[in-house]
Amino acid sequence: FSDEVTNKKFIKKNKKFLGYYSFSNFKKRIYYLFNNILIWKYRKKSSSFIFRYYRLLNFQDFPIKMKSNKKKFSFKNFLIKLYVRLLSINFILFLIKKILNNKYFLNKDVSVYLKKINPDLVIYPTNAFEPLVSEIPIICKLYKTKSFFLIDNWDNLSSKSILINHPDYISVWGKQTANHANKIQNIPQKEILIGGTPRYDIFFKKEI
């Protein structure tokens, strides 16, 4: 589990619990900036990407007039526009991905846990945006383990960013999200499973 979870006392009661993983604020920032580059680079894949980009700029230059998007110079926005355009150049983007995928940059906590238990499959629930989502597929390949993502919400694959590394398999809510996985994230259909969501299971129980 991430060290940011809230119910740690309950988690520690599980005898199979191995421990937490963590990310430094610096590394979180790196992935945040990289995701901003990706939403600009692949903005034509989803209208939600370009909306997220404008939100990053406080809706400056947004096509629809809003109180917060009046034409005024913002040095912060200027820097954002500059770095997303410059770093989204194919060659530079390739180099950044190479660095992020380097085994010396990967999460050490997760690597230690996988080496210790040597699993056949790693099942990872995700919103498709946090730093570890980019590292799990690479770490699993290093230890010759299959990776399986459980996507947390119906719009995560169309509204967050682009997955720079694909898992071996991915489970989604329904047909719409399966289409997002294939068309937006370029995940082959044979690797996409429609698993639904456990959030609604309680409504089908006789007693609530």
Which stretches of residues belong to each language-model region?
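Structural motif
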Residues: 1-4, 23, 125-128, 152, ...
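Short N-terminal targeting/anchoring amphipathic segment
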Residues: 111-130
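Short, charged/polar "capping" segments at the starts of alpha-helices
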Residues: 4-10, 131, 177-181, 203
